[in-house]
Amino acid sequence: MKALDQLSFDNRFARLGDAFSTQVLPEPIAEPRLVVASESAMALLDLDPAHAELPVFAELFSGHKLWEEADPRAMVYSGHQFGSYNPRLGDGRGLLLAEVLNDAGEHWDLHLKGAGQTPYSRMGDGRAVLRSSIREFLASEALHALGIPTSRALCVIGSSTPVWRETRESAAMLTRLAQSHVRFGHFEYFYYTKQPEQQRVLIDHVLEQHYPECRDAEQPYLAMFRTIVERNAELIARWQAYGFCHGVMNTDNMSILGITFDFGPYAFLDDFDANFICNHSDDRGRYSYANQVPIAHWNLSALAQALTTVIEVEPLKETLGLFLPLYQAHYLDLMRRRLGLTTAEEDDMALVERLLQCMQRGGVDYSLFFRKLGEQPAADALKVVRDDFIDLAAFDAWGADYLARCDREPGNAEGRRERMHAVNPLYVLRNYLAQKAIEAAEAGDYSEVRRLHQVLSHPFEEQPGMQAYAERPPEWGKHLEISCSS
């Protein structure tokens, strides 16, 4: 493992030039202190986790110190926000500090969120508050533990710097890790500003650095776009299967790598509700749970439009047409596994849809249902979960078909239990748990944030003394309103 001064750097994106980003120094926050750090994220940089407790760690990730090799940059991009094009967005409060080259030959962006004003701040103060920084940290690491592709969170650094939102809050900085911070909106920016040369430079950069397997294809750009479509189909399938709602699926929040990116007013489903809206600013439900699939397709079509400078329209349309069948295949595979099924039958999707309809009518806790379904042999488990449903006739009919389906599966009850426990989490990041940790942190107690992070890092394993994190949320905890304010 390495010390902080032993990291290797290779700032590839910064070398693209000033057309793609602006050099900006971070604005330090006062009295920086470590709130929480992720050991597994530190391992991506080969960093010794013990170094998180050193004063220099907080100084480096709060803007007080910089590595000599750092080249902090605010990236420029645009994007469609709630369906309307915004021609100039960019990093309004974040900086790409540097790219770390680890011992495995992987490049990891160090991105400092809440680093102060940039040319793209648009009247904002460039700061992030403690609560939003904690929420992004917890979500990044929780999704990673669930096997959902995501950016990672290295740490949150708190401070005594005041900032004003609805009330006075304290500023914080979150260090995000990703192998690229290029978004769909980067390509839209150069397309709509009619800068084809710069756009081709960006496309070649992404192809060379992030999709090298596509370079030797007959049409490398089209092969890259197809891979982006494939990755997004799998990503959204995982969101839907695990009940994750992003909340702000603007094209500037879509990663070119097909990972979960830019966490705001997200939520995991508590009671199953296909029409659930986690962002209280989303009056029309554009980014509701049910709409995430068509919105992902819409966003990919926006990316495709931006790529028409280098790819013919018809091949782009054909490739876009792959998204929905790919999504459906991934989603059905994940739901089979959540139900303990290892083989495929023609009526499996109908079985899943009928279950979700029963859940919708009964207000059934989405995550706990699957966990309880795997606790015992199928017939016994159905008796346990039956009490959670309202339409008992419909559930009993579903249960009979599910039992018959299980009877056609190979293996025994114990094997089924192990399979289901390996894919059905006991612990999920519920908004009320995050809120309790945030309130403690705002009062100066970081122990709950760290404890919750540790619990969520092992979501499938029962952890002694942590039963409170596996409970159904109280009524007040189901209706927390989360906005984009951060």
Swiss-Prot record:
Binding site for ATP: G90, G92, R93, K113, D125, G126, R176, R183, D262
Record's keyword terms, sorted: ATP-binding, Magnesium, Manganese, Metal-binding, Nucleotide-binding, Nucleotidyltransferase, Transferase
Enzyme Commission identifier(s): 2.7.7.-, 2.7.7.108
Known cofactor(s): Mg(2+); Mn(2+)
Binding annotation for Mg(2+): N253, D262
UniProt-annotated catalytic positions: D252
Pfam families: SelO
Catalyzed chemical reaction(s): L-seryl-[protein] + ATP = 3-O-(5'-adenylyl)-L-seryl-[protein] + diphosphate; L-threonyl-[protein] + ATP = 3-O-(5'-adenylyl)-L-threonyl-[protein] + diphosphate; L-tyrosyl-[protein] + ATP = O-(5'-adenylyl)-L-tyrosyl-[protein] + diphosphate; L-histidyl-[protein] + UTP = N(tele)-(5'-uridylyl)-L-histidyl-[protein] + diphosphate
Keyword Signal: no
Molecular-function GO terms, alphabetical: AMPylase activity; ATP binding; magnesium ion binding
Disulphides: none
InterPro entries, A to Z: SelO
HAMAP family assigned to the protein according to its UniProt record, in alphabetical order: YdiU_SelO
NCBIfam families assigned to the protein according to its UniProt record, in alphabetical order: PRK00029.1, PrtAdtaseSelOPseudom
Function recorded in the entry: Nucleotidyltransferase involved in the post-translational modification of proteins. It can catalyze the addition of adenosine monophosphate (AMP) or uridine monophosphate (UMP) to a protein, resulting in modifications known as AMPylation and UMPylation.
Similarity annotation: Belongs to the SELO family.
Protein name, as recorded: Protein nucleotidyltransferase YdiU
